[in-house]
Amino acid sequence: MLRRASIMHVRIAFIILLAICLSLIGRFETSAQNRSRANLQRRNTEIARMVTEIEARNIERTIRKLVSFGTRNTLSAQDNPMRGIGAARDWLFSEFQKIAAQSDGRMTVEKQSYLQEAQPPPRGRVPKPTIITNVVATLKGTQPESVNRLYVVSGHYDSMCTSPIDAECDAPGANDDASGTAAVLEMARVMSHYKFDATIIFMTVAGEEQSLLGSTYFAEQAKKNNLDIEGMFTNDIIGSSTSDTGMRDEHTVRVFSEGVPSSETEEEARTRRSVGGENDSASRQLARFIKEVGERYVPGMTVRMVYRRDRYLRGGDHMPFVERGYAAVRFTEPNEDYHHQHQNVRIENGVQYGDLPQFDDFNYIARVARVNAAALAALALAPASPKNVGLLTKKLTNDTELQWDANHEPDLAGYEIVWRETTSAYWTNSLRVGNVTRYVMKGMSKDNYFFGVCAVDRDGNRSPVSYPKPIR
């Protein structure tokens, strides 16, 4: 009897020990899969090399050349080869053509022009019909399944002094927005030597100071032609690291993104109010992606996400895109100097006014351009964000079941589910789930977390996150 009891005790101890071992193995496997987003990311060597090739001296050269045209007011001369917006337009077109000539035929350049009807003051800023021209360089993607997926980066090359309809005054616009224009041109120069799955559009627009005219026309045409623009960046006032109060910050760039989509329908609004998601628009996901990628590839730079569509009561060239349902964000320096913005060039009470190149920080602009380039490259190399992502709600349960449509990229490795606390600004956790289109997060209630899904290719390139809609 004693011997039988001893054998039974040994068996019980063995079973307990085996259960503990299996539990530890399970925990190890889970922890290996369920790691923080930061730990899961690895650097792409091509992107790392690309950002080092962006040079401040090229950006400075472009800014000084644009300033040399005296004014780039949209209403200024279009047929003068030395002064006015026409001279700036033609020079930019020529520079993009030089870049395209070195791209093995993958980049094309065009002038996108239209006749803007008069919108006279006080309501408008176009006293007479005016030709508006965007200079657009398109770097075609090399993967057939992704070539029609587009990413747009822009700066506006027009400028203004105190009055937006004064076409004669000097309006150097070194920061607003030769800085953004120069960043776009430098990105095109560097990135044209690389191949991407998706297509990237480098665009310099006119008419921004006349109420976003050039960008509105481009966005309207894109919507009309059903272009698949998955993300749009505008760079506007990225030139100075010092504010008018002397505050200096050389290592921060603000990225503005809207939460509730401008294009939201009433039905979509009702759903959002029922399930949350006011901080999970496509534009907000794009901003999170930029922060994650930009800070990974540009050491020392902080991408400060601002939960606004733009600065207080102000606007930029990303707005026509978000209003038409595209994900779009704005890059801007951390602290603006209003002595050098929309001012006639003058000295008053010992203070220099005017948007002059001497107030630009060319090294800072280069750092912002590197953040842009890293994010653009990561987007164009990654698979598309999963489509029709849904959270199944047919029955009450403390599990969370997600489903999505399959991607079609040939190099797709699978998908990743991400989640965060409802009070967290960023995705904090992720789980590789393989090449499936449905997955159940056991023991994780949809009431307590926000979930999302991204696609991952065989090289580890990840798409921006898609936020799910409820499926009843």
What feature does the model see in each segment?
Residues V67, I238-E258, R304-P383:
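Active-site-adjacent mobile loop/cap segments within catalytic or ligand-binding domains
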Residues N398-D411:
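Conserved aromatic anchor
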Residues R35-S36, N58-K140:
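A non-catalytic alpha/beta surface segment that caps or lines the substrate-entry region
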Residues A137, V153-S154, D158-L212, N372:
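Alpha-helical metal-binding/catalytic segments enriched in His/Glu/Asp
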Residues V205-G316, A328:
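Metal-dependent peptidase/peptidase-like ectodomains
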Residues R458-R472:
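Extracellular fibronectin type III
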Residues V184, G434-V440, Y449:
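Short S/T/G- and acidic-enriched coil/turn segments that sit immediately N-terminal to beta-strands
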